[in-house]
Amino acid sequence: MRKGKIAAQASHASLGAILNYGKHLPEVEGKYESVNISLRHQPLSEWLNGRFTKVCLYVNSEQELLDIYNKAMYNKVNVKLIKDAGLTEFNGVPTLTCLALGPDYPEVIDPITGHLKLL
């Protein structure tokens, strides 16, 4: 992917993970609500009010990306997987491009992504 495409896909994943985080909370009932509701949940609150840390890592294939996604789902870690429609890259083929985990504590995320290299 081109650098701009990588940035866009990472932005989609990051925002999607935040929106998913609130979506899975019992009191929100599947709707995207204001961040104020979600701030009652410790990992998200600490992340939003702290350093807002994000790390970009590299995988070698769509399958490796899907494996990370499945591992996150298995461990009940908030995750958002992005599939690009393929309109500007990938020759019109919908392609898995990116995912975001969390926000959560390093001890939750690192066992899933600790083996990956920085982008």
Task: Label every PLM stretch briefly.
Residues 1-119:
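Positively charged, small/polar-rich N-terminal and surface patches that mediate targeting and assembly
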